[in-house]
Amino acid sequence: MALQQEIIQALGVKPQIDAHEEIRRSVDFLKSYLKTYPFLKTLVLGISGGQDSTLAGKLSQLAISELRDETGDQSYQFIAVRLPFGVQFDEKDCQDALAFIQPDKVLTVNIKEAVLASEKALREAGIELSDFVRGNEKARERMKAQYSIAGMTKGVVVGTDHAAEAVTGFFTKYGDGGTDINPLFRLNKRQGKLLLKTLGCPEHLYLKVPTADLEDDRPSLPDEVALGVTYDNIDDYLEGKQIDEKISQIIDGWYVKTEHKRRPPITIFDDFWKQ
């Protein structure tokens, strides 16, 4: 089997989807997990103002609202968490996303002081962080805050990982990649847009240029610049379409290089890294 087909199979991507069916599938998935573990009462998710967290947030709120209606248990809650590093340049998009999602509760945790304190402690130990590694520090601090909130609210941390992100490993290991449950897994980027459009999301939230915005030296660096391919390229690849050989090789390369990110910690029984 060609690598492209192996990847499509591993990530569960369909060449075509019914948006209503996929919305229902994700909502039921979240509900089923919470119903299986009745001691869990909240879904917790960081909201950045981008496409992925907006979609995951809306699906989470729909799931929680339905659970309350179906069970009569009013303790179920969706907690949206704003996690700016100082002042976020696209704060209006974040507020627009929250207005669309209508979360039960919004918490704001400014991670700047925590990141700077960590950087200072490392510097005193003789470790000077590069701008790139400092960016990963931000992502991990955001996830740490979400797990603290989840720990105090009987919660589950919801992730935003989707197929176009997974295939390239475009996430921080144990940062935004370190979550409990991923309702967007199997969808590529354009399919996520379709779900948001179907849900009535303001289009500027899913048409904006995707950026992780973690690096201070390269603020708002577009994902597509960092990856060297466009999301349309990646989506075509994941839908099984024939694409330019050079583009295909770049995507193949990202997948192979980042395999460790998609696996739990490597043990003596693993051998994928030897191949």
Curated annotation (Swiss-Prot):
SUPFAM superfamilies: Adenine nucleotide alpha hydrolases-like (SSF52402)
Annotated deamido-NAD(+) binding sites: 140, 173, 180, 260-261
Molecular function in Gene Ontology: ATP binding; glutaminase activity; metal ion binding; NAD+ synthase (glutamine-hydrolyzing) activity; NAD+ synthase activity
Binding site for ATP: 46-53, 160, 189, 211
Pathway: Cofactor biosynthesis; NAD(+) biosynthesis; NAD(+) from deamido-NAD(+) (ammonia route): step 1/1
Signal peptide: none
InterPro entries, per the entry: NAD/GMP_synthase (IPR022310), NAD_synthase (IPR003694), NH(3)-dep_NAD(+)_synth (IPR022926), Rossmann-like_a/b/a_fold (IPR014729)
GO cellular component: cytoplasm
NCBIfam families found in the cross-reference section: nadE, PRK00768.1
Chain's role: Catalyzes the ATP-dependent amidation of deamido-NAD to form NAD. Uses ammonia as a nitrogen source.
Full protein name: NH(3)-dependent NAD(+) synthetase
Species this protein is from: Cronobacter sakazakii (strain ATCC BAA-894) (Enterobacter sakazakii)
